[in-house]
């Protein structure tokens, strides 16, 4: 026991040192004066030791039986190739990981097992490895050799690189968050990070293969069309026209000229799935490039889609054609207030334009069995289905959260005008109006209080009372929190008949 005790203690010390801590042991070199990205600065050579076995099968045996003796660091494989036709200086972390059986000259590649990161030399290995591990190596004629492992810029994550180059006072909140729209990454850098925008943008561009361009929002949304001034901080700037996939649809648009928010995809999907039914008529008052209208049209919902922004209207038409929903979606370029007031008339005009008030929609051809293809002389006949356009509108979508509630007054009287005052004979439409309900930081506001505030704004805009539209008749869905004290809601309710 007196002989075994030091060995046991030594083995325990190694096990203890091998346990993975939450801190990654290999951080990139630091240069807080860097303003233009220098990738070569991050090449780091780490002295290690590897075990080389004459019999390759012993690699797995040693790795399994002596787990606490081998390198166990995330993102670094413990099995590496030990010989290469390239000089060590040219090795990169990517090449370290390519474990092929032969190099470019068909020379067999010898693989080895990297020892624990605390072992930096052959002398370290003989001093730190437990005796049973050393005995196994000796029995199998293994050789402990020095090995230089090379890490480079590609090895580290974006946050790790940025933490190595940004000033220390910014390390608590390294700006790595962004939204992706098509091939564009969109950042909203705070003022203190603006001097480092090109550095931040280039790192994000490098670390995300699908991104070709990184933009930063220069100021808050202030234009009439909810677009914002932006700066290209990395990547190509010749075209900001993107293609974005959402709800099994493809949307094409110029990201700098229209409003698009990728974070709203679940809200687009929610309304289309939960409320809009095939054959119903939906008016999308602030349609943008069609994230509500186009998926609804694919579902055989009949949509009147409107947007005031000429660029949005241009791409709305293009997306209608691109997604083959021209039969069920009509586009308009009007002010939202005018569109609401004229919507019953626009629907009646559509009905008149279609023969018999019906829309004929082509269906995909039925796939024929191979035997039918040989036997039938006639090609498959085109198939169609018909949708009767209803004479009433079932839903209005108003996704303009800054000001949509202020447009509600335009509903007053429009149905009476088209039904000769007999509004009790028609089914009043549902309105889905998006809004913000901001409150001061520090205020303790309950969800019920916020709901009551939104309800009060709605009935005030409609010029009705709480008896006409009770709070419990309004469904309030929290879409997202734009900021901790700025929730965005979608209020859904059926218009009161006395509107």
Curated annotation (Swiss-Prot):
> Gene3D superfamilies from the xrefs?
Met-10+ protein-like domains (3.30.300.110), Vaccinia Virus protein VP39 (3.40.50.150)
Residues reported to bind S-adenosyl-L-methionine: 268, 307-308, 335-336, 399
Q: Name one GO cellular component term.
A: cytoplasm
What is the protein's major site of localization?
mitochondrion
Q: Which InterPro entries match?
A: MeTrfase_TRM5/TYW2 (IPR030382), SAM-dependent_MTases_sf (IPR029063), TRM5-TYW2-like_MTfase (IPR056743), TRM5/TYW2-like_N (IPR056744), tRNA_Gua_MeTrfase_euk (IPR025792)
Q: Which reaction does it catalyse?
A: guanosine(37) in tRNA + S-adenosyl-L-methionine = N(1)-methylguanosine(37) in tRNA + S-adenosyl-L-homocysteine + H(+)
Q: What class of enzyme is it?
A: transferase
- Superkingdom as given in the UniProt entry: Eukaryota
Keywords in alphabetical order: Cytoplasm, Methyltransferase, Mitochondrion, Nucleus, S-adenosyl-L-methionine, Transferase, Transit peptide, tRNA processing
Q: Which GO terms describe its molecular function?
A: tRNA (guanine(37)-N1)-methyltransferase activity; tRNA methyltransferase activity
Provide the function of this protein.
Specifically methylates the N1 position of guanosine-37 in various cytoplasmic and mitochondrial tRNAs. Methylation is not dependent on the nature of the nucleoside 5' of the target nucleoside. This is the first step in the biosynthesis of wybutosine (yW), a modified base adjacent to the anticodon of tRNAs and required for accurate decoding. Postspliced cytoplasmic tRNAs are imported into the nucleus, where this first step seems to take place, after which they are reexported to the cytoplasm, where the yW sythesis is completed by cytoplasmic enzymes.
Question: PANTHER family annotated for this entry?
Answer: TRNA (GUANINE(37)-N1)-METHYLTRANSFERASE, TRNA METHYLTRANSFERASE
Task: Give the multimer and partner information.
Answer: Monomer.
Leftover remarks = Present with 4120 molecules/cell in log phase SD medium.
Could you tell me what this protein is called? tRNA (guanine(37)-N(1))-methyltransferase
Q: Which organism is it from?
A: Saccharomyces cerevisiae (strain ATCC 204508 / S288c) (Baker's yeast)
Per the UniProt record, the lineage of the source organism begins with:
Eukaryota, Fungi, Dikarya, Ascomycota, Saccharomycotina
Q: Which gene encodes it?
A: TRM5
């Amino acid at each position: 026991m007196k002989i075994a005790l030091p060995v046991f203690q030594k083995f325990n010390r190694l096990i203890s040192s091998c346990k993975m801590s939450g801190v990654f042991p290999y951080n990139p070199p630091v240069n807080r004066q860097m303003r233009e990205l220098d990738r070569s600065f991050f090449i780091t050579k780490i002295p290690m030791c590897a075990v080389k076995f004459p019999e390759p099968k012993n690699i797995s045996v040693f790795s399994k039986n002596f787990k606490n003796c081998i390198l166990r660091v995330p993102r670094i494989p413990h099995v590496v190739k030990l010989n290469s036709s390239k000089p060590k200086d040219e090795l990169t972390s990517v090449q370290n990981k390519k474990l092929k059986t032969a190099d470019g000259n068909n020379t067999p590649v010898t693989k080895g097992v990297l020892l624990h990161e605390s072992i930096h030399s052959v002398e370290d290995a003989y001093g730190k490895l437990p005796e049973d591990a050393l005995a196994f190596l000796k029995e199998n004629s293994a050789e402990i050799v020095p090995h230089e492992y090379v890490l480079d810029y590609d090895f580290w994550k974006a946050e790790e690189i940025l933490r190595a180059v940004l000033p220390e006072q910014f390390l608590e909140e390294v700006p790595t968050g962004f939204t992706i729209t098509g091939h564009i990454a969109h950042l909203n850098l705070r003022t203190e990070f603006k001097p480092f925008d090109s550095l931040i943008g280039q790192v994000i561009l490098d670390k995300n293969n699908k991104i070709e361009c990184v933009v930063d929002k220069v100021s808050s949304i202030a234009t009439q069309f909810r677009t914002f001034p932006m700066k290209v901080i990395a990547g190509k700037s010749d075209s900001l026209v993107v293609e974005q996939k959402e709800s099994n649809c493809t949307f094409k648009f110029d990201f700098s000229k229209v409003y698009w928010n990728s974070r709203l995809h679940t809200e687009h999907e929610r309304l289309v799935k939960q409320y809009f039914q095939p054959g119903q008529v939906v008016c999308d008052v602030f349609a943008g490039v069609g994230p509500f209208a186009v998926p609804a049209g694919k579902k055989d919902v009949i949509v009147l889609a409107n947007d005031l922004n000429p660029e949005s209207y241009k791409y709305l038409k293009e997306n209608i054609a691109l997604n083959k929903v021209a039969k069920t979606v009509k586009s308009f370029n009007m002010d939202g207030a005018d569109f609401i007031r004229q919507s019953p008339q626009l629907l009646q005009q559509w009905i008149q334009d279609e023969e018999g008030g019906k829309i004929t929609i082509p269906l995909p051809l039925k796939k024929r069995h191979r035997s039918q293809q040989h036997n039938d002389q006639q090609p498959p006949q085109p198939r169609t289905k018909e949708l009767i356009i209803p004479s009433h509108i079932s839903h209005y979508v108003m996704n303009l959260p800054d000001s949509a509630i202020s447009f509600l007054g335009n509903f007053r009287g429009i149905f009476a005008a088209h039904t000769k005052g007999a509004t009790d004979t028609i089914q009043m439409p549902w309105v889905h109006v998006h809004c913000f309900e901001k409150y001061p930081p520090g205020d303790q506001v309950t969800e019920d209080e916020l709901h009551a505030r939104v309800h009060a704004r709605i009935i005030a805009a409609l010029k009705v009372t709480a008896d006409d539209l009770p709070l419990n008749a309004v469904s309030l869905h929290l879409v997202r929190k734009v900021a901790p004290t700025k929730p965005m809601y979608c209020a859904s309710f059926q218009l009161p008949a006395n509107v």
